[in-house]
C-alpha cells in the first residue's frame, strides 16, 4: 500500500494529477481543495495517499493535509459513498465544515454537493454522527449557522452565481458573525457579496 508520495508534478488537472517519482508517473485523484494548493508543473509535491484496490484497478487518492485524508477515510465507510464521491464532497467542503455539518445534522448543506442526493446525505449524517467527537478550539470558535432557510438560500444563491462552495461557506460564516444569528436572507446575501467583492 502507498501511504505517501513525493515527487515532481508532471501534469495537473482539476480531478487528477500525475506525480513523477524516480521516473514512474503516478496518477493521483485529488479534491479541488488539494488541487488549488498545488505548485506548478515541474515543482516538487508531497501528498498523503490512500490506495484504493478494486478487482479491476488500483487507484491513488491524494490529500495535502492529514485532516482531509482522515475525513475521506470516514466518508468511504458510509454505505453508497465511494472514493470518487468522497473526493467530490471534499472538493466542496473543508473537513472542519463537514465535521460541523455532521454534528449539527445539516443535510441540506450536503445535498448542495453534486452527486449527493437525499438518501446519501441522510446516510452520511446517520453513519458518521457517532464517529465524530465534539472538537475544541477552532471548531468551537466558529459561529453557529443561521436558520436553515436563510443560510441554505444564501448558500445556494452564491453557488449558482459561480462561487466555489468552500469560498461561499467561508464568506457566509463571516457575514453571520457580523450580522448576528438568523438574519433575513436578503441582508445575509448582501453582506456576503460585499465580503466576496
Curated annotation (Swiss-Prot):
Q: Just give the chief location class.
A: cytoplasm
Region annotation (Domain III) maps to: 146-197
What residue spans carry the region label Domain I?
Answer: 1-64
Q: Where is this region: Domain II?
A: 65-143
Enumerate the InterPro entries for this protein.
DNA_helicase_Holl-junc_RuvA_I, Hlx-hairpin-Hlx_DNA-bd_motif, NA-bd_OB-fold, RuvA, RuvA_2-like, RuvA_C, RuvA_C_sf
**Disulphide bridges, residue numbers:** none
Segment forming the signal sequence: none
Query: What GO cellular component term, any one, is given?
Result: Holliday junction helicase complex
UniProt function note: The RuvA-RuvB-RuvC complex processes Holliday junction (HJ) DNA during genetic recombination and DNA repair, while the RuvA-RuvB complex plays an important role in the rescue of blocked DNA replication forks via replication fork reversal (RFR). RuvA specifically binds to HJ cruciform DNA, conferring on it an open structure. The RuvB hexamer acts as an ATP-dependent pump, pulling dsDNA into and through the RuvAB complex. HJ branch migration allows RuvC to scan DNA until it finds its consensus sequence, where it cleaves and resolves the cruciform DNA.
Similarity field = Belongs to the RuvA family.
Q: What name does UniProt use for this protein?
A: Holliday junction branch migration complex subunit RuvA
The major lineage groups are:
Bacteria, Pseudomonadati, Thermodesulfobacteriota, Syntrophobacteria, Syntrophobacterales
Amino acid at each position: 500500500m502507498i501511504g505517501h508520495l513525493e515527487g515532481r508534478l508532471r501534469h495537473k488537472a482539476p480531478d487528477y494529477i500525475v506525480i513523477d517519482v524516480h521516473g514512474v508517473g503516478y496518477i493521483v485523484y485529488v479534491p479541488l481543495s488539494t488541487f488549488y494548493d498545488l505548485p506548478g508543473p515541474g515543482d516538487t509535491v508531497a501528498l498523503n495517499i490512500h490506495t484504493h484496490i478494486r478487482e479491476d484497478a488500483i487507484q491513488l487518492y491524494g490529500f495535502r493535509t492529514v485532516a482531509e485524508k482522515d475525513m475521506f477515510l470516514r466518508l468511504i465507510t458510509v454505505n453508497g459513498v465511494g472514493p470518487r464521491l468522497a473526493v467530490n464532497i471534499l472538493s466542496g467542503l473543508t473537513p472542519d465544515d463537514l465535521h460541523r455539518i455532521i454534528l449539527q445534522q445539516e443535510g441540506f448543506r450536503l445535498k448542495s454537493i453534486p452527486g449527493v442526493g437525499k438518501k446519501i446525505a441522510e446516510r452520511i449524517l446517520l453513519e458518521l454522527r457517532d464517529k465524530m467527537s465534539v472538537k475544541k478550539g477552532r471548531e468551537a470558535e466558529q459561529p453557529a449557522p443561521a436558520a436553515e432557510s436563510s443560510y441554505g438560500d444564501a448558500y445556494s444563491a452564491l453557488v449558482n452565481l459561480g462561487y466555489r462552495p468552500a469560498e461561499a461557506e467561508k464568506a457566509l460564516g463571516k457575514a453571520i458573525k457580523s450580522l448576528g444569528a438568523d438574519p433575513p436572507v436578503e441582508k445575509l446575501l448582501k453582506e456576503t457579496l460585499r465580503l466576496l467583492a
